[in-house]
Structure formats: structure tokens, C-alpha cells
Amino acid sequence: MGIFDFIKSAGKAIGIGGGDEAPTADALKKELDSHKLGTENVKVEINGDKAIVTGDVADQSILEKAIIAVGNTLGVSKVESNLTAPSQKDPVFYTVKKGDNLWKISEAHYGKGKGAKYNVIFEANKPMLSHPDKIYPGQVLRIPELD
């Protein structure tokens, strides 16, 4: 499906150790499964600082969430997705910059006056986001289409 870039030094630290070393495949798989997305049959491999995810998922939403759950991990700079989902589309991702908030991101993607749609972005990134105000520079978010 493609290779997606992430910021290696930004993200959630998992496993033991420190710095921005890539986590093990087992640690990444455990992190992915902890979100209870329905990714039990997804395989995770590591090649340097690139994570490779392979398998079938139930829908586009899970596919995109799996990519960002793995990519928003400290030490991962790229995610190669070999995931498949019914009626698959190219995902839209956004890398958070300093000074961003979900309202501002919503207006940038959906148009002026659509900042109140920030909740659509928040809901699309749960359970990786726990609160609309808890985003950080370098974090990658999925931007769903508006219905």
C-alpha cells in the first residue's frame, strides 16, 4: 500500500531502553494490539527504524489507525504498510506542528469555519488520543473524510 514517514524522535516510548532506538517487533505488536483495533492477525516486522505491517483488517479506519499506532512510536521513522482492507483508499495523514490544535487542523483540512469538526479528527484517532488537547509536535494524525 505504501511507505509513510514519521518523526523518529517523537512518539510514545515502549519497551525498555532509551533514546530513539527502534523498538522490537514484539514490543510494537504488543503496542498495536493494546489499542484493541482488531489487529490480532496483523504481523509486525522491524528493519532498522522502519516498521513493516502486513495482514488483512476489517476496514479503512482500522488500516489507518494501525499505521499511526505503530508509526507514532519512539524510534520508528517509517511504516511500510502491506495491510489490506475492503474498498481501500489512500489515507490522509497530518503531522502536528508546534502551535497546532485540533480546531486549527480541522479548519486547514475541511475549510474555514469548519474548526468545530475537530471532534471528527479526535474520534478518528481514538484510542491513540485520550483527549483533544493532548497532541504534540511530530505526532501523526489521520484525517478522515467528512460525511
Predicted regions and their residues:
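Secretory N-termini
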Residues: 1-85
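Soluble periplasmic/extracytoplasmic beta-strand elements of cell-envelope proteins
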Residues: 43-45, 52-54, 80-82, 93-97, ...
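A broad structural signal for alpha-helix termini and local helix breaks/kinks
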Residues: 36, 74, 109-110, 125
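Primarily a LysM-type cell-wall glycan-binding module
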Residues: 48-52, 57, 86-113, 147
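Extracellular LysM carbohydrate-binding repeats and other cell-envelope/extracellular binding modules
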Residues: 69, 73-87, 116-147
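Extracytoplasmic/secreted envelope proteins and their assembly/folding machinery
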Residues: 25, 29, 67, 102-103, ...
